[in-house]
Amino acid sequence: MNPVESFVFPDIPKTIRDVLFKPDKQMIIVGVIGKSSNPTCNKLIGFNLLTTHPALTDSKCCEGRIKFYFENDGNVLYLHFETTFDQQVMAEQLAKAIDTGVQDNFVNFNSYVRSRFARMLLFAIQVCHMIVLVEPTSVFDTSYLSIFKSLKIIREKYVLKFLPKLLKASNVGNYMGKEARLCSPRFIFLFEGTCDIKPEDVEKLEALECAVEEDIYKMLRTEFIITNNSAMSLFSIPRSKKFVFFSSDSKAKSDPLLDSIDMLMEYLDKPAAGQQGDKDEEEFMNKLRPCAGYGMSAWSVGAGAPKTERERSVLTLIKKHVAEAFEHGFDDSVSKYRGRSHFAVPGFKSWFEGFKFLHKIFIENPDNQNYEPVDVDYKAYLENFHKVIDIDERFFADVCEHGMELAMVNYKEMLPHHYSGTFHEKKYQQARELFLRYARGPEVEKHELKLKDYCDSIWLNGKQQCEYPSLRGNPCALGKHKANDPMDHSSGVVFVSACNCGRTQGHREDPYTIRQANYEFYQLIAKSCSNCTLLERIKFPVFEPSSSDFRAAEFINKNLSNLMSLENSNRTPDTGTHPPMTNDHSPHLSGSQKSQDSASNLTFSIDDKEENETHAKNYASQGDADEALEQENLNEIVIKVGEHADQTDKEKAILRQPSTTEYLPGMLHATSPIGLLPQFPSWSLVCLGPSSIYTHNSGLPEHIQSGFLSGSNFLLPWDVSVRLEHAQSWAASYEKIRNRKKNVSQSKSSDSSNNFTLKIFIGIEYECLRGHRFIMSGPDTVLRGGSGIVRDSGSKVVFNDMPIYFPCLCRNSNVAQLMRVHIVTPKAPVNVILEPKAKIFQNNMQSNFTFTTGQPEPIKLTQSAYWILRLPFVYEGDEGPLMPPSEVNASNAAMHGILLAGMYGIKESEISEELL
């Protein structure tokens, strides 16, 4: 018969049943549980109890399996528990979790492993007298403390409520008493890990064991896992006996297959048989035997001297405790609680019946998902076991909840009545960052979604801002509302702008309609201006309904409409920079009517943009002497006076009559349908008064033009030399009147009758949203007032495209916009004419719109007067407003929009003595 028998619960071989189920068979139950690092998961290897290595006999390990071991001549039953703390079992469970995806993170998997182990440990505490906790290292795993503490809570709160009732109802386990267990089991801690102490140095090993015992005892007492009353403790610790053992036996981690290979190699390296001594040969052969006496005769086995048991082994320590259990039982209580502890050693048959019942209560039923407990206390145990054991999940849930609370408070701090989605996202990100400082574990994503939903609910429940964009791109600051009219919106942004004449500055609300931006504000501020309502002005074409039944025009193919209308119109589609529209018989300057003596081909109305830029560069690069000569030739023009246009030309010049039932919904631009006019003008042209208002020595006075930055309130002089041809009668009349006023004889003035010089003052004014105004002296140069102001000429702004947007000189680097053109006309028998065109680029100059005033002919300005042309504040294309750039610099200003060159011209006027 094998000295050590074993079987796996619940299958008991008949031969073993006959031995164990004897009526007088009493045994001390020793549970072996903990961790193992070998593939068989067998933790009894280091006990020196097994005659054969488990790797040669045991099958594959399985989580939850309980194997019984006992000696035929002994009275100790060893229960070997295979749990999730065994390395091989844990690896299999991990692979299964990865394949199924049940545990999607480490914390959940670790929680599962701890919960399964704790359930088996609690069951062992109920059915064992002693428990050996095996640790494959030399260090105590302090994570056991949380498991012990949780099991103590579970036992006191749930187990002691339902288990006595169930035991009584089942008529099994009467020997367990009111504590529903054999006794308070005594724990032995076995460490199989190697340490620096050699096995021969027994004293040092024992000193180490004593030190570890003291540390473990303190930790268990501190956590109240053991108390003075062992009956109220989860388990007990012996008061005067060892309960910690450091194993120095290398067999615990040996592999028989590898050992056999090593011995075979050693045997092959030895001398031939017969050449070594009999004693050495016998020792080597004993190593090869799988168990003692294997392959030897019975006489040989019995003939040897009895082998004495090793003095230092964990099995020896266990048997000492077993002897105490049989003699006195375990009473590890302190002082007044001694003698009150329950200790029972029932017959094996009675114990086994109770074991099966408790196994069903603690192991089988929790694994059965369809099991419905009848007892309320037992049901509470099943529902709350994992919650109590799983301190990691509780910890992570608590820190997530704490972080969640702080994040919620952070989000709600200093919230305005209404706020935008951008502000909401910013506040949420701040709250999220605070949450992530505290939150840890698998619940982070779940709580993060809850935080997102919470913040969104606050924002959407009465805090959401309208955010409808203004024409300047600013969102509406009001709460979410349904607006029937864009005027119902308000961004709360206030700008500073000057009126049409520039005399008065006022605050304006951020516009939401083109009418509000380009018309209504200027009508409103005109009431506060002492000038605007009294000034002479040019009226631009607007829609005039013939009845109350009118509507906005709807058109699909604008290009087709334009091509059809161009045949009956003298307006040309936008192809770049256009000259003022003239003909050979027109009495004003055309694009080709230049002096033959002029070296350049530049005119007021420039035919070619590249030609304009070439001459502008040449002009800028010449010296002072050449500059004067070039300037004289550049600004010399020829006016040919012909007969009035005949009837045919007049008919040709007549445009299609505008519609009186449909109006243009947007702003006029070069490709707008012919015959449609807007409801209001986006441009303004007013006469500020006589030319004497402006004095070039002092510039624009503050009381006439407010808000100009220092040194930039000067207009630019533009000297134009005019030569008359084929107009003797016109020139003679002009000279006669002029000489009569000057008392000069006609003969003296005849030589100069065909030549005279005009001085025109031009100012291209920019205005930022804070009301800062300044004049520019060139496409990329801001006018700087000073002693050199006379040297700056208006030619640069006349013959070059001027940017619509330019950086302001103020601290905030705001974007200034071209808002006004100042023209001081000369006192001469000619009229300055204007045909302004503003080209706005979009999508990196991939598309553009050229906006016009809608006048069929260039605008004629009166002589000797100060005129101000106010440009639109906002430009709107066919698909909506054209947003100004958020930032701009001098190098890329022209990429966003330009005021096309060629907007100025000269036309003859009637001669009168009042003029001269």
UniProtKB/Swiss-Prot annotation:
The keyword Transcription does not apply. Keywords: Nonsense-mediated mRNA decay. GO terms for biological process: nuclear-transcribed mRNA catabolic process, nonsense-mediated decay. Residues 566-626 are annotated as: Disordered. Residues 589-604 have a biased composition (Polar residues). Involved in nonsense-mediated decay (NMD) of mRNAs containing premature stop codons. Probable component of kinase complex containing SMG1 and recruited to stalled ribosomes. Belongs to the SMG8 family. This is Nonsense-mediated mRNA decay factor SMG8. It comes from Aedes aegypti (Yellowfever mosquito).
